[in-house]
Amino acid sequence: MNKTPTTLIIMDGFGMTNGQSGNAVFAANTPRLDRFFEEFANTTLSASGLDVGLPDGQMGNSEVGHTNIGGGRVVFQDLPRITRAIEDGSFFQNPSYLRAMDNCLKNGSALHLMGLLSDGGVHSHITHVFALLELAKQKGLQKVYIHCFLDGRDVSPTSGAGFVAQLAEKCRELGVGKIATVMGRYYAMDRDKRWDRVEQAYDAMVYGDSEITNPDPVDAVKKSYEKGVTDEFVVPVVCDANGTVSENDSVIFFNFRPDRAREITRALVDQEFNGFTREFFPLTYICNTEYDASMPNVEVAFPRVLVNNGLGEYLSSMGMTQLRIAETEKYAHVTFFFNGGSETVFPGEDRVLVPSPKVATYDLQPEMSAPEVCSQCVERIESGAYDVIILNFANCDMVGHTGVFDAAVKAVETVDACVGRVVEATLKMGGIAMITADHGNA
C-alpha cells in the first residue's frame, strides 16, 4: 500500500527581507512560490542569534539551521560553547589542548594552529585562536606556527588582510606565534573531494612548497587583492619556511564546524588516505570538535553534545520510513547535522546523494544539481515508499556565497521551479508539503 508522504523542503539560504537592494529572492521570478504564499498559510521565522542557539546578533548558517530543524528545539551551538569556556577559564584546562602542548614540550617539537581566520562565527572565530596563543604562552612553548585560512564568504571578501594583521599584532603582544602560511579556504576547506585544491594547501603547510613565498603575510594578502584575487581564493603562500608540519609535531585545528574540516584533516592523519600522494607521519592532532567519528589518530577538544529524540530518531521509533536527499554540498546537512551531529543512520532511514557539479564556483552553474535532486525526489515520492521525505535545495546559499547577483537570481528561479514539481508530486499522492529555509543568504 502506498504511503501518503509528508515532504519537508528546505530551501537552503532562502531569506526573507523587506530590503530590495541586492535581494535575489525579491528580484527573481518565482510564480510557484508566489502562489503558495498567496494560497497557503505561512509565516516567517528567525534563523539567527539566540533563536538558534548562537550568540545574540550572530548570523545563522546551514549547519545551525539544520541542527535546529532536526532537533525540534533550540540547540546551543559550538561557537557560544567554546566562547563560554574561554570566559570561565575551562578552555585553558582542556585536556586535549594540554596534551598537544605537553607533546611539544616533551619532544621539542612545534605546535601548529590552523583554521579559518575571521570573526564570521560560522566555522571558527578569531578569538579562539587568540586564546590558544595565550595558552601556548602560559605553557612556555617556543615554536608555535599559525596556518591561516582566509574566509571571504561569511565576512567581507577583502577583510582577510585585517584579520591577519590582528593576528600578527596578537603574536607580537604575547611574544609567541609566527604566521607560517596564508591561503584561501577554497584550497584548505574543500568538502567535495577536489583533491587538487587540498593538495596545494597540504604542500604549503607540510613541505613549504607554494608558488608564492612572502615573509610578510599581510603584504601577501594585499598583493593578492591587487591581482583581483580575494580572500577565499588566495593561493597558498609560505611566509615562514621553518613552520612546516613535521613528525611528532602537534596540530590544533580550531574550526568547530566539521564539514569543511574533514578533508585536510584526513590528509594529515589517515594512513589509508589516497586522495593524493603524500607521506604519512605521526602527529598529535586535536580537532576542536568531532569532525568525523571514523577519523583516526585524532583527539577532540569539545566532544559533541547529543541531541536526543530529534525528528529522525522519533520517526524511526514510530516505525515510519524517511528519506534524506540532497546534492553533495548539502548532503551532510540533511543527514549529519539534521541528526544532531550524529553519524547514525536510523532504522527506516534511506539516503540519496546527488553529486554536485564540478565547477570552480557555482555562479558558473547556478542551477547546480537541483534538477536531478528534484527528479530523484519526485520518483521516490511516486514510489509510495516513504512516510517522510526531507530534501535540500542548495542553490540559494551556495550561489549566494559567490556574490554574483544575476547568478543568485537564476539560483532562486531554479529552486522555485523544483519546489513546484516536488509539491505537485506530493499533493498528487495525497500528502503534505512543508516549505522552509534554514537561514537566509540569497
Which role fits each region the language model picked out?
Residues 2-7, 14-186, 196, 200, ...:
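Active-site nucleophile/metal-coordination loop of metallo-enzymes that catalyze phosphate/sulfate
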Residues 83-91, 356-367, 400-413:
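Glycine-rich tight-turn/loop motif centered on a GG-T
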Residues 155-246, 252-253, 261-264, 269-281:
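Long, well-ordered, tryptophan-enriched scaffold segments
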Residues 320-380:
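Metal-dependent catalytic core segments for phosphate chemistry
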